[in-house]
């Protein structure tokens, strides 16, 4: 590395985000830009570690969830190039493994940093921020340009779904010379990138559409408002193309089939987030074609990234109160002995939505080890409250952990909107059934 002692000379540093109380008044991205000189210092912190676990992207020991970058980004190489001020070379190395670093650099949870060797004894290298800085600098300098293939293979490929998997698949196949058509059932290209992740986390016009326009200029064709399996049969695409690739994602949400589930005001998180972003892009919310949390008591069930996005969105609407339920225990402040480096550190943190809620209402909105028992509606059929109980995890007769209610911990929560953000069960069935594809 160009600065062998950099990790001892420079402390970890990130650009300061816009104030939570200011940023909840708009839908703009809230991460500020770090000066180039400070970015070079951060790149210098990447030590000559010998075995860079940051880009391992594999399981280290049986039973763990893996460590390092799942797409094997060449992290030490472009960190060193940033330190040297060789930004264009850093961009070239970044693009060797990552089609869309402007997406991952904004929304990836950065398992690379959890596996950084510097992080064993000190705060890890700011890999994620360096990554997004490289690609944004590349766009600013005009280095990221359309690169249509010099020759066409004569083969055609249909890609179903224009989310990150579909776009990456299309980019790779198009680069190999094949003619690619991407089918998207929504009115805009991007899938989860467009309608699943809120604008303040990933700007749609400046970031997502910028890349989509570049892909179009490279020769990829996009057909929106076209649901394969309904508007066009999957078999038709098989017959009309040399290959068909399914990139529809896991869009089937986990439900909560308890008493009162049919009451109005209980929504899947993606319905809430999708409608919000579509209305924002269509009319700046002037059309009111979204589920508004303004003045409402909002409860989010689920503690993952989607739940966090629901919190941030509800706050920007101007919700009256906000609570978030997590059935798992509160993570420890530091790694547990059962969660050693280089595994992803399961530790307590405030993500952006919880940070904003704490600034707005004074407390982290999350409650841990809590389970919803039933929903209760008013005389007009709208949700007005939900009932919960605290739980502890205990093993059943088969040795599996199951939630056990704690007697006397029952509580009633006022609720005008309930958002279910409990993960996803897999892909939808229509197209898979048509093509007789087996599922795990």
Task: Enumerate the language-model features and the residues they cover.
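Residues forming the flavin
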Residues: 1-37, 41, 131-440
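Ferredoxin-type iron-sulfur electron-transfer modules in oxidoreductases and energy-metabolism complexes
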Residues: 24-41, 52, 62-67, 71-106, ...
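Short FAD-binding loop at a beta-strand-to-alpha-helix junction that anchors the flavin cofactor
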Residues: 44-50, 298-299
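Short, cysteine/histidine-rich loop/knuckle motifs that typically chelate Zn2+
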Residues: 48, 56, 68-71, 115-118
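Hydrophobic or amphipathic alpha-helical targeting/insertion segments
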Residues: 108-122, 241-247
């Amino acid at each position: 590395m160009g600065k062998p002692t950099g990790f001892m000379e420079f402390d970890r540093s990130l650009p300061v985000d816009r104030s939570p109380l200011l940023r909840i008044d708009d839908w703009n991205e809230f991460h500020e830009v770090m000066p180039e000189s400070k970015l070079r210092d951060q790149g210098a912190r990447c030590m000559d570690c010998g075995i860079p676990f940051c880009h391992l992207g594999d399981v280290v020991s049986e039973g763990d969830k893996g460590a390092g970058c799942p797409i094997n980004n060449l992290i030490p190489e472009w960190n060193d190039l940033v330190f040297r001020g060789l930004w264009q070379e850093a961009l070239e190395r970044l693009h060797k493994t990552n089609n869309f670093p402007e997406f991952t650099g904004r929304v990836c949870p950065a398992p690379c940093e959890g596996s950084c060797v510097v992080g064993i004894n000190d705060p890890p290298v700011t890999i994620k921020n360096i990554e997004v800085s490289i690609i944004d600098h590349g766009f600013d300098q005009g280095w990221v340009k359309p690169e249509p293939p010099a020759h066409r293979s004569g083969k055609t490929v249909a890609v179903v779904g224009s989310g990150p998997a579909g776009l990456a698949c299309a980019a790779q196949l198009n680069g190999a010379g094949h003619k690619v058509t991407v089918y998207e059932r929504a009115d805009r290209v991007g899938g989860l990138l467009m309608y699943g992740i809120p604008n303040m986390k990933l700007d749609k016009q400046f970031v997502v559409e910028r890349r989509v326009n570049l892909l179009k200029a490279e020769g990829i064709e996009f057909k929106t408002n076209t649901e394969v399996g309904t508007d066009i049969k999957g078999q038709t695409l098989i017959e009309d193309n040399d290959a068909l690739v399914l990139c529809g994602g896991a869009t089937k949400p986990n439900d909560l089939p308890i008493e009162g589930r049919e009451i109005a005001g209980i929504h899947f998180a993606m319905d809430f987030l999708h409608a919000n972003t579509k209305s924002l892009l269509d009319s700046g919310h002037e059309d009111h074609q979204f589920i508004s949390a303004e003045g409402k008591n909002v409860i989010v069930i689920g503690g993952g990234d989607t739940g966090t996005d629901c919190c941030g969105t509800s706050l920007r609407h101007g919700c009256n109160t906000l609570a978030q339920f997590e059935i798992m225990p509160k993570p420890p402040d530091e790694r547990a002995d059962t969660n050693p480096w280089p595994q992803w550190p399961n530790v307590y943190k405030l993500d952006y939505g919880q940070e904003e809620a704490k600034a707005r209402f004074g407390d982290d909105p999350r409650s841990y080890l809590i389970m919803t028992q039933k929903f209760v509606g008013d005389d007009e059929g709208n949700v007005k409250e939900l009932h919960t109980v605290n739980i502890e995890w205990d093993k059943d007769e088969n040795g599996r952990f199951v939630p056990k209610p704690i007697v006397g911990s029952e509580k009633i929560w006022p609720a005008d909107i309930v958002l279910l953000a409990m993960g996803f069960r897999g892909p939808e069935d229509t197209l898979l059934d048509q093509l007789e594809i087996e599922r795990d």
